[in-house]
Amino acid sequence: MKQVTGGVCAAQGFSAAGIHCGIRKNQAKRDLALIYSAVPASAAAVYTTNLVKGAPLTVTKAHLADGKAQAIVCNSGNANTCNADGIAVAEEMSALTAAALHIAPQDVIVASTGVIGQPLDLAPIRTGLPQLAAALGDHSDQAAEGIMTTDTQPKEIAVQFTAGGKTCTIGGIAKGSGMIHPNLATMLVFLTTDCAISAPMLHAALTGDVQDTFNMVSVDGDTSTNDMVAVPVSYTHLRAHE
């Protein structure tokens, strides 16, 4: 296994971007991130076991019931948690993302991170998503910045390895510096890969692997309401050879 550059864009078929849309007051801070697969992808996710869960997790779990996704959208600055309209807001965020990308809303993984208990204003997201979609490219670093809250620096990595004679790539971005404690998923983590793997096997691999990785991380003993590790698989390179 070797480390490569590119973050979530290192795996074939993925693009990403991050912008400041206005959720956060500091205009120098990106607050909206997008990861996109050029084709529908197998996908899996694991979630916090906190009894209080953010609305985005509820919506994402429903969307991933079929084991498929094509995009991940995440805002920072507001967790969309403990809000009466949280589910509706998360669903609308998915719909806005889907419209900007011309995909189905149920193929969008939605996540939010930030202050708990404050309503999430969709106006800046509604305005920013078309711009964000248009900016998609090899911008994993932007997406990594877009999901940060109290983090002191962005977190991204990508590795390559050989399996069955084929080169596979896994990329990832993450956020989290507080409210980190085992009981999955410890923090927000978005992974991408171009490995040929089915949705059931992907879920089994992810669920098993986090036990010896993310579930061993503790900073302050607080399990967050919005923790998630999500991974879509792009088959762009496979379709190119069909």
Regions found by a protein language model. Give the residues of each.
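N-terminal amphipathic/basic leader segments beginning at the initiator methionine
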Residues: 1-47
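Active-site-flanking structural segment that lines cofactor/substrate pockets
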Residues: 35-67
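Short, well-ordered amphipathic alpha-helical segments that serve as non-catalytic structural scaffolds
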Residues: 52-63, 88-100, 203-216
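Glycine- and acidic-rich phosphate- and metal-coordinating loops
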Residues: 70-77, 107-113, 227-233
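Glycine-rich, mobile lid/loop segments that gate access to catalytic sites or pores
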Residues: 100, 105-214
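Channel- or pocket-lining gating/hinge segments that regulate access to a cavity or pore
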Residues: 193, 233-235
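Glycine- and Gly-Pro-enriched alpha-helical subdomains that act as flexible
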Residues: 217-218, 238
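Conserved small/polar residues in nucleotide/adenosyl-binding loops
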Residues: 236-242
